[in-house]
Regions:
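His/Glu-rich zincin catalytic helix
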Residues: 1-85, 192-221
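Charge-rich, well-structured scaffold segments of protease-associated domains
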Residues: 1, 21, 80, 84-221
Length: 221
């Protein structure tokens, strides 16, 4: 199927990058730099911590999910029935990570070699959710410790105290990771519902910058 290419040139520095609309609906941004020794890739979805109330369609009833579920979902996507995505990245030499913000969740890696193999891993694990009662409950302790760590961070607490003072009802006032109490309510069914709502390719963007062949990247996608 045809892909829609567009070349975009930045007004400030004059560099150009390619924007491609993949037949799957995925938006792909490509910034080839031949002299770069490291290549960076990031796959993001427009889904963050503030999206805890949503409708899956105009006909569907509104849904409300526990605070921190977007961040919880980010953690759980790295785990599959066959193993851990970090282990797969280690075999290609790539350094991988992820983060959740108020409005987005992103999965990323950097590498100096085996780019296309690493890209396949990224696209594979993000599109292959695997949640069970056992694995979801196990993660509660891990994320609970992360929440307590941020509770001891003065800068983090000042920021959220400020947001709570400014916003009396908007979900931006709540911690991105949720609370120990809210994450205890998260179930595999809730994770699948959020995944199926927000992790569709039309709601996602893939961006690469570094030394690569744009056509080969699109072949992987």
């Amino acid at each position: 199927m045809d892909k829609q290419w567009q070349t975009i040139t930045g007004k400030q520095v004059g560099d150009s990058y390619f924007q491609v609309r993949h037949p799957s609906g995925l938006t792909i941004l490509l910034y080839p730099k031949e002299n770069s020794s490291t290549t960076y890739a990031i796959l993001g979805t427009r889904y963050g911590s503030i999206d805890n109330r949503f409708q899956r369609s105009d006909e569907a009833a509104p849904e409300e999910v526990p605070e921190g579920i977007a961040h919880y979902l980010e953690h759980k996507l790295f785990e599959s029935e066959d193993g851990d995505a970090f282990d797969r990245f280690s075999k290609t030499g790539a350094s991988a990570n992820a983060f959740t913000s108020f409005e987005t969740t992103c999965y990323l890696f950097s590498c100096t070699d085996a780019l296309y193999e690493s890209l396949e891993i990224l696209l594979d694990f993000v599109q292959a959710p695997y949640f069970t009662e056992e694995t979801v409950q196990k993660e509660q302790g891990i994320i609970g410790q992360e929440i307590k760590m941020y509770d001891d961070d003065p800068q983090w607490r000042v920021m959220f105290n400020y947001l709570k003072a400014m916003y009396h009802s908007h979900p931006i006032r709540e911690d991105i990771a949720g609370t120990v109490e809210s994450i205890a309510k998260i179930t595999p069914d809730l994770l699948y519902r959020c995944y199926n709502t927000f992790y569709n390719l039309g709601n996602m963007v893939l961006a690469l910058a570094g030394n690569f062949d744009a056509e080969k990247v699109l072949e992987v996608c």
